[in-house]
Amino acid sequence: MEKVQEQPAQTLSETAEQPAERVVEQPQDSAATAAPPGDSKEAETEKPAEVAPKEDSKEAPAPPPAATTAATADDANSDIIEEVKDKAGANTQVADPKPQEPADTRPSYLVNNAALSQFFDRLAPIVEKAGHNEMWGVPLKDAQDAPTVNIMIKFLRANEGNVKLAEEQLVKALEWRKKMNPLALAESAAFPSSKFKGLGYITTYRDPTTEKNVVFTWNIYGSVKNVDLTFGNLEEFIKWRVALMELAIRELRLESATSVMDYNGEDPYQMIQVHDYQNVSFIRMNPNIRAASRETIEVFSTAYPELLKEKYFVNLPVVMGWVFTALKVFLSKNTIRKFHPITNGVNLAREFTTFGEEIPKTYGGKGDVLADSGRTVTLQDDKAPETKPEENGNASQAPEAEPASGNPAQTDATNGPAKDDAPKNDKPAVPTDTKTDAPADAPANTLADAPADSRPN
């Protein structure tokens, strides 16, 4: 009996030991294999528990396909999730309740300049209020019209970007043009040659470096034979001066502009002014000159802003240097920068190295005299008043007697009678009455062409 009992015990013991080796990989069953081999009943009871690990060990290689399948499923699910997200995002965009702002279709010069844009918003009411829409030969239209934009920029610049002030000035300028009709003055008006002959000219020179025309206006004050006669009729003098200015503006070709100038850049639509004081004496101020200068300032500062590029005072006596010193107190640095006093007129050509030779010889160039090369307003011989012989000694009447020689056209061309009478009566009047023609008229015309700069700093 003892042998029979021992044999199964060994078998059971071996059986118990085999799973024990396998259980190394199954830590959870280590407690069962560690049971003592003496109790067969416990071994038999534990045997079924050992079978399970066997089956598990045989089925162990199966998980990889399941993992691959799970990974594939996860990838597919992730793709689906991403697609759902994309669709959800797309739906979210479409369903955005906030309206999208329309693109700004305005020109860049309005987008980048709020003041100019506001100024254009006021253009229609400005034109309606003034009852006139023409400025310097250009019909004011809208922000798509380059000539209109350039003119609006000039008025805004003249007022340092202040829209309200620019609007007020433009209204006044349009009202003045409606009343004065300066285009007609330049095109069809005729002025007495005895008063204005030789006083003003316009020339144009080609600058080879820029391939653009440079417009000059010349005021030759030494040609004035009788100050009272030339400046005595204030309304007539202003009309003559306006007509000359309009002719110069016509040379700028503002109406032909195809592009808008840079608000903060160079202005290509400006002119150069030359005031010649040869043979003019500066002793005292004539009341007529004072009145003419004051009126010129008022008119030109309103109606012709930002048209002056540089201003040259030639043949100016050294003693007149005080004029520019005084002007520095009242004018801005920008205006003073445009003033160039030149004592000797022949040095003027040196200021323009690229086309200086075209300037008249009188001013250091090789060009013809202004009487031959310059353009001016329409002049006509004024009719001589019926005067008694003893009245011919009156200096103010002497120039008016020029046509009495018989042939008015020939008299105007030769200026014969005027030359005969000038030494006797007119010459003393010039030194006496044109003393401050330079300081009065110089700032007058300069300020008229640059009103924004005419304000004190």
From Swiss-Prot:
Residues 1-107, 378-457 are annotated as: Disordered. Keywords: Cytoplasm, Endoplasmic reticulum, Heme, Iron, Lipid transport, Membrane, Metal-binding, Microsome, Transport. Residues 7-16 have a biased composition (Polar residues). SUPFAM superfamilies: CRAL/TRIO domain, CRAL/TRIO N-terminal domain. Residues 196-371 form the CRAL-TRIO domain. It is found in: Cytoplasm; Endoplasmic reticulum membrane; Microsome membrane. Residues 428-457 have a biased composition (Low complexity). One of its GO terms (biological process) is regulation of exocytosis. The keyword Cell membrane does not apply. It holds the Pfam family CRAL_TRIO. It catalyses: a 1,2-diacyl-sn-glycero-3-phospho-(1D-myo-inositol)(in) = a 1,2-diacyl-sn-glycero-3-phospho-(1D-myo-inositol)(out). Transmembrane segments: none annotated. Belongs to the SFH5 family. Non-classical phosphatidylinositol (PtdIns) transfer protein (PITP), which exhibits PtdIns-binding/transfer activity in the absence of detectable PtdCho-binding/transfer activity. Regulates PtdIns(4,5)P2 homeostasis at the plasma membrane. Heme-binding protein that may play a role in organic oxidant-induced stress responses. This is Phosphatidylinositol transfer protein SFH5. It comes from Coccidioides immitis (strain RS). The gene is SFH5.
